[in-house]
């Protein structure tokens, strides 16, 4: 979601609360519960869930492996659920031409640096950079080069949904708004 006026540009970006993450967390959770219940059923020698016949499965080695896969899947699905709950990667970029200030805010994993907040002057922005790598794993990333602070990514490195035309258009609009040149590398 973007909001623009004559002097302010605010761009809100989704973090880990995407439809795909919800889908994979649920699928992984249900699948790992199935594996774990089959492993436990093979240990007990009776069916816990009637849909999953596990009396024919020996506990050693198949039941142990199924239990291990179930526990590993529960850990991975709990990791996905935590990233969704904490909204890791959610952020906004605010460019204010009137005050000459750029603010970049990012949510990270809980800890000392959970909130990353960068604030700098617009006159310190040297250029908008586009990185384009084609091939099997294409990458199209938009960066902002800042004097004294290096290069800051403005788009996610995992967003592969930008076509070359979309990333060029976004870079051109932002460069025009900020009145800085565009570099492609």
Swiss-Prot record:
<comment type="similarity">
    <text>Belongs to the Ycf4 family.</text>
</comment>
<keyword id="KW-0812">Transmembrane</keyword>
<dbReference type="GO" id="GO:0015979">
    <property type="term" value="P:photosynthesis"/>
</dbReference>
<dbReference type="Pfam" id="PF02392">
    <property type="entry name" value="Ycf4"/>
</dbReference>
<keyword id="KW-0472">Membrane</keyword>
<keyword id="KW-0793">Thylakoid</keyword>
<keyword id="KW-1133">Transmembrane helix</keyword>
<feature type="transmembrane region" description="Helical">
    <location>
        <begin position="21"/>
        <end position="43"/>
    </location>
</feature>
<dbReference type="GO" id="GO:0009535">
    <property type="term" value="C:chloroplast thylakoid membrane"/>
</dbReference>
<dbReference type="InterPro" id="IPR003359">
    <property type="entry name" value="PSI_Ycf4_assembly"/>
</dbReference>
<comment type="function">
    <text>Seems to be required for the assembly of the photosystem I complex.</text>
</comment>
<keyword id="KW-0602">Photosynthesis</keyword>
<dbReference type="GO" id="GO:0009522">
    <property type="term" value="C:photosystem I"/>
</dbReference>
<feature type="transmembrane region" description="Helical">
    <location>
        <begin position="68"/>
        <end position="90"/>
    </location>
</feature>
<protein>
    <recommendedName>
        <fullName>Photosystem I assembly protein Ycf4</fullName>
    </recommendedName>
</protein>
<keyword id="KW-0934">Plastid</keyword>
<keyword id="KW-0150">Chloroplast</keyword>
